[in-house]
A protein has these predicted regions:
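C-terminal substrate-binding/catalytic lobe of Rossmann-fold NAD(P)-dependent oxidoreductases
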Residues: 1-95
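NAD(P)-dependent Rossmann-like dehydrogenase/reductase catalytic/cofactor-binding core
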Residues: 78-80, 85-133
Length: 133
């Protein structure tokens, strides 16, 4: 998990401390994420930033028991983020709960998004497949 995250982010120096837990769910990955920022960031600021991120849906209202569940992302492309709160152990850390459908966002949808990005950058082009005779 550490090597994969560093590779995805393109940063070998990033500090990561993962714990993998397997639970019997039909589909989906859930992650407890601890984020340390350069400057203090309030949970409200974090919600606002994440709300503007493409492919991210903030589901975060603990007072109404509204937070992301793995069942909520089955068949969806969006990644849901909630339980955004300060980490009491560090003034520049926040804790988040993140869920996503690994079959869509982790595989199929990501493959399509990568192909679209490569096409936009002119690195691949669409070719016509000849009709069968």
């Amino acid at each position: 998990m550490m090597a994969e995250t560093r590779k995805i982010l393109g940063r070998e120096d990033i500090g990561i401390s993962p714990t993998c837990v397997r639970v019997p769910v039909y589909t989906g990955h859930s992650e407890a994420v601890n984020v340390q920022t350069r400057e203090p960031l309030s949970p409200e600021q974090c919600r606002e930033i994440l709300s503007g991120a493409p492919g991210v849906l903030v589901v975060d209202d603990p007072n109404d028991a509204l937070y992301p569940l793995a069942i909520d992302v089955a068949g969806r492309d969006e990644v849901l983020v909630g339980r955004i709160r300060r980490d009491p152990s560090h003034e520049r850390c926040l804790n988040l709960w993140v869920v996503g459908d690994n079959l869509r966002k982790g595989a199929a949808t990501n493959a399509v998004q990568v192909a679209e990005l490569l096409h936009e950058r002119g690195l691949i082009r669409r070719t016509e497949t000849p009709a069968p005779a």
